[in-house]
Amino acid sequence: MAEFATIARPYAKALFGLAQEKNQIESWLGGLEKLAAVVQEGKVASLIDRPETNASEKADILIDLVGLKDKELKNFVIVLAGQKRLSILPEVYAQYQDLTLSFNHIKSAVIYSAYPLTDKQVGELVQMLNKRFDSELKISVEIEPELIGGIKVEVGDQVLDLSVQGKLSALYTTMTN
């Protein structure tokens, strides 16, 4: 959700800045991942949405469920609970993860394919994409049958569409204009 992204951004940046100071970037990433997963569970999500449960109870429950030990992460959860922002934790995690990758000079990339790719094909694609984007890429592969054939690659806000669906869409646009 775009709204959650806008709201989560300053929280993720502030937490990342503190993590840099404390040299805790990777360990906090793990804690945020657990928090994001727990918040998305049905019972926990409904608890977060209940107005009769106060903020400190919600924070304590989350902290206990995840087993947080780090004082700063606990305080972060308490602040989010106080601001009624616990539901943005998955987006905070996603943005914190992007900041971590960027800090480590790694970009996140998604390869969409109409059909499953072999390990060899993925390896060759990774080599080509690393050269094209001049950085190390963290790759995930997703199957999208609606592409018909070929692949589509997203790296940050850049899209490389080499799919049959993309070619047909471009042809349609050219013919109708």
From Swiss-Prot:
Compartments where found: Cell inner membrane
Record bears the keyword Transport: yes
This protein's record includes keyword DNA-binding: no
Membrane topology field: Peripheral membrane protein
Gene Ontology process terms (BP): proton motive force-driven ATP synthesis
A Pfam family annotated for this UniProt entry: OSCP
GO molecular function per UniProt: proton-transporting ATP synthase activity, rotational mechanism
Domain of life (superkingdom): Bacteria
GO CC terms of this entry: plasma membrane; proton-transporting ATP synthase complex
Keyword field: ATP synthesis, Cell inner membrane, Cell membrane, CF(1), Hydrogen ion transport, Ion transport, Membrane, Transport
Database matches in PROSITE patterns: ATPASE_DELTA
InterPro entries in the cross-refs: ATP_synth_OSCP/delta_N_sf, ATPase_OSCP/d_CS, ATPase_OSCP/dsu
Subunit structure of this chain's protein: F-type ATPases have 2 components, F(1) - the catalytic core - and F(0) - the membrane proton channel. F(1) has five subunits: alpha(3), beta(3), gamma(1), delta(1), epsilon(1). F(0) has three main subunits: a(1), b(2) and c(10-14). The alpha and beta chains form an alternating ring which encloses part of the gamma chain. F(1) is attached to F(0) by a central stalk formed by the gamma and epsilon chains, while a peripheral stalk is formed by the delta and b chains.
Function: F(1)F(0) ATP synthase produces ATP from ADP in the presence of a proton or sodium gradient. F-type ATPases consist of two structural domains, F(1) containing the extramembraneous catalytic core and F(0) containing the membrane proton channel, linked together by a central stalk and a peripheral stalk. During catalysis, ATP synthesis in the catalytic domain of F(1) is coupled via a rotary mechanism of the central stalk subunits to proton translocation.
Family: Belongs to the ATPase delta chain family.
Protein name, per record: ATP synthase subunit delta
Protein source organism: Neisseria meningitidis serogroup B (strain ATCC BAA-335 / MC58)
Gene field: atpH
